From Swiss-Prot:
Highest rank taxon of the organism: Archaea
Gene name per UniProt: csa5
InterPro entries given in the database record: CRISPR-assoc_Cas5 (IPR010157)
Subunit-structure text: Probably oligomeric upon overexpression; does not interact with a Cas5 (Sso1441)/Cas7 (Sso1442)/crRNA complex. Forms dimer and tetramer-sized oligomers when overexpressed in the absence of CRISPR loci A-D; the oligomers are probably responsible for its toxicity in the absence of CRISPR loci A-D. Part of the aCascade ribonucleoprotein complex, minimally composed of Cas7 (formerly Csa2) and Cas5a, which binds crRNA. Other possible components of aCascade in strain P1 are Cas6b (SSO1437) and Csa5 (SSO1443), while SSO1399, Cas5b (SSO1400) and SSO1401 have sometimes been seen weakly associated.
Gene Ontology biological process terms from the UniProt entry: defense response to virus
Sorted UniProt keywords: Antiviral defense, Toxin
Name this polypeptide is given: CRISPR type I-A cluster 2/Apern-associated protein Csa5-2
Species of the source: Saccharolobus solfataricus (strain ATCC 35092 / DSM 1617 / JCM 11322 / P2) (Sulfolobus solfataricus)
Note: The aCascade complex was purified from strain P1.
GO molecular function terms listed in the Swiss-Prot or TrEMBL record: toxin activity
A Pfam short name: Cas_Csa5
Segments crossing the lipid bilayer: none
Length: 150
């Protein structure tokens, strides 16, 4: 089973998946269902649902992986390329920094929630934070650009 830091990395990638699903679908419902899940079955269903939504975005070329250069204090190496996921939804463009989970991550996460459903709550809270920060950054960019979409 995953060690502590590896568990945190898995939770982060699951949170990225949920955030991408939220931004693409423009609905926090999946994140809410995930964060409020009381059983592993409920978490598993939401994981399936969000992966289907993301798959639709990938198939439509509205979700794609990329790399971006970060200039800021939030990241250890300024000017370095970081993995990211671009999301285009209803004319809005968002970028989630980090990776989406692998199939092994999903398998490990499902084992983790068998031990404690708290991991799903943690991933849900993190996903909402990621999405809110990205949406807020997008709105600030629009106001700086005279209200145009990013």
């Amino acid at each position: 089973m995953a060690q502590k830091s590896e568990k945190e990395n898995i939770i982060g990638r699951i949170a990225n998946l949920l955030a991408v699903g939220f931004l693409y679908s423009e609905s926090p419902t999946l994140v809410d269902r995930f964060a409020n899940a009381l059983s592993k079955e409920a978490v598993t269903k939401v994981l399936y649902d969000v992966q289907r939504i993301v798959q639709m975005g990938i198939d439509r070329s509205e979700i794609a992986t990329t790399t971006i250069t970060i200039q800021g204090k939030d990241y250890p190496a300024q000017g370095k390329d970081y993995p990211a996921v671009n999301v285009n939804s209803s004319g809005a463009k968002y970028t989630v920094v980090g990776y989406l989970p692998t199939s092994q991550d999903i398998e490990d996460f499902l084992r983790m929630i068998e031990e404690d459903v708290y991991y799903a709550r943690k991933a849900g809270a993190l996903a909402m934070s990621i999405a809110n920060r990205i949406k807020l950054g997008s709105k600030q960019s629009k106001s700086e650009q005279g209200g145009e979409k990013k």
